[in-house]
Amino acid sequence: MTVRPGTDTSTATMPSQLVWYARCPTLTAMGLLANRGALQREFLREPINLVSVRENSTPSVRQGYLDHSLPNLIREGDAATALWSYGLNQRSRLLAVGHTWHTVLVVASGRSGIGRLNDLKGRTLALPREAGAFSPARVRSLRAWETILDTVGLRASDIEFHNIVADHPSTPFGDIARREIEAVLSGQADAGLLFGAKGLELARAAGLKVIHSFTPEVIRNDPALSGLVELRTLTVDYPFLEANEAVVARLLRQLTSAADWAAQFPKEALNHIALEGKVEVADAAQAYGPLINAGAALGAEDWRLRDLQVLLDWLKLRHAVDDSLNLTPWQRTDVLNIFAQPTDIKEKYKRLNVVA
């Protein structure tokens, strides 16, 4: 390698640090940044290599994303899985919480006699169950069904659930929604749930009857529908955070800017969301309504943490996590207030490769 006189070789001689990032294929701050290359640009001239879990099909990487055992991982995904994985190995730390409000459809076959939510009494409802120790899809659907039934005074004892067997949640491009549709069309289940833009697309393609559509605005404005909110957490590998707090703070600062960017460039944001979910722009627009920038926001306000506590209590009641699990030791939301100061490059990254 030829180096000109006076050139700073400190970064050139440093080995690159691999940092994994992961997000759900819906509206997330990380998705908005990833599609614009903003995360990579933040560290363009530094020995940090950001790699998406989504583009990697190695089983150990996919499993490590799910249980947060993957070193150097920063993850924005469903909160239930994050809580479960923290209870499993205490490997992660919570940086921020996000809320996604999107359309939730109650659907039945076109020939079904179900015309309204009250008609669900005595019916069989589709409920997914992924393989493995923890099923995020089951948590989401069960909370949603309980919430929906409660709006019309029904309980779980008034209906029956039909289990939809699905792949392990770490499987790339798993397709639970299509399996639910198959169960509804075949008569194994009388009704099912479809979520977000992909749900709108699939319901239309399958010719399903929409019994009820809960819009994002209605969900956000009605506390009784809080079980329909997609609660997300931004978490980070704890050893990586301890060794590289300034790096994590910079990543977090980028992620918390996504909502402002979405507000300034709504058309571009909508296009990115459609790309993330592999859906049409019109379906993404209908699914999220006017709440895209609100849904992209991340923070640690009291109301966000209260909603996270409600979810944790729900999981404890169903023995999905240990009763001793506590949010307080998990939190590192103080990183939201850290602003990395410019320092000598050697000092700044001398601990960068501490984490294996």
Can you say where each PLM-predicted feature lies in the sequence?
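Short, glycine-/small- and polar/acidic-enriched structural segments
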Residues: 4-8, 12-164, 354-355
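Short glycine-centered helix-capping/turn motifs at secondary-structure transition points
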Residues: 31-32, 36-37, 187, 206, ...
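Short, solvent-exposed loop/beta-turn-alpha elements that line the ligand-binding surface or hinge
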Residues: 40, 44, 217-223, 294-303
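Short, surface-exposed acidic
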Residues: 45-53, 154-161, 245, 276-289, ...
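Pocket-lining segment of extracytoplasmic ligand-binding domains
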Residues: 172-272
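Secondary-structure end/capping motifs
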Residues: 244-320
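Conserved C-terminal helix/tail region of periplasmic/extracytoplasmic solute-binding proteins
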Residues: 315-356
